[in-house]
């Protein structure tokens, strides 16, 4: 059974990483990014709920006299 020659693997792996890095750099360089991003304030509409318009009194069990 012949021996597997792995002497060129390091060169192939390093060249692959280099090519991938260059490809990603070229892809990223073509993107248009905003120069001055600003936060947009989103306003949620206030919804009136029935319990907000009525006055209710809540009695806690611990606050009752003994």
From Swiss-Prot:
Keyword annotations of the record: Acetylation, ATP synthesis, CF(0), Hydrogen ion transport, Ion transport, Membrane, Mitochondrion, Transmembrane, Transmembrane helix, Transport
Localization annotation: Mitochondrion membrane
A single GO BP: proton motive force-driven ATP synthesis
Major subcellular location class: mitochondrion
Gene Ontology MF: a single term: proton transmembrane transporter activity
Keyword ATP-binding (UniProt): no
Claim: Transmembrane is one of the keywords in the record: yes
Modified sites of kind N6-acetyllysine: 54, 57
Listed transmembrane segments: 8-24
PANTHER family recorded: ATP SYNTHASE PROTEIN 8 (PTHR13722:SF0)
Subunit structure: Component of the ATP synthase complex composed at least of ATP5F1A/subunit alpha, ATP5F1B/subunit beta, ATP5MC1/subunit c (homooctomer), MT-ATP6/subunit a, MT-ATP8/subunit 8, ATP5ME/subunit e, ATP5MF/subunit f, ATP5MG/subunit g, ATP5MK/subunit k, ATP5MJ/subunit j, ATP5F1C/subunit gamma, ATP5F1D/subunit delta, ATP5F1E/subunit epsilon, ATP5PF/subunit F6, ATP5PB/subunit b, ATP5PD/subunit d, ATP5PO/subunit OSCP.
Function: Subunit 8, of the mitochondrial membrane ATP synthase complex (F(1)F(0) ATP synthase or Complex V) that produces ATP from ADP in the presence of a proton gradient across the membrane which is generated by electron transport complexes of the respiratory chain. ATP synthase complex consist of a soluble F(1) head domain - the catalytic core - and a membrane F(1) domain - the membrane proton channel. These two domains are linked by a central stalk rotating inside the F(1) region and a stationary peripheral stalk.
Protein known as: ATP synthase F(0) complex subunit 8
Origin species: Ovis aries
């Amino acid at each position: 059974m012949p021996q597997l020659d792995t002497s060129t693997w390091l060169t192939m792996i390093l060249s692959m990483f280099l090519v991938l890095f260059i490809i990603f750099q070229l892809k990223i360089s073509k993107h248009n990014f905003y120069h001055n991003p600003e936060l947009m304030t989103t306003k949620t509409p206030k919804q009136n709920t029935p319990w907000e318009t009525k006055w209710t009194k809540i009695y806690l069990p611990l606050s009752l006299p003994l």
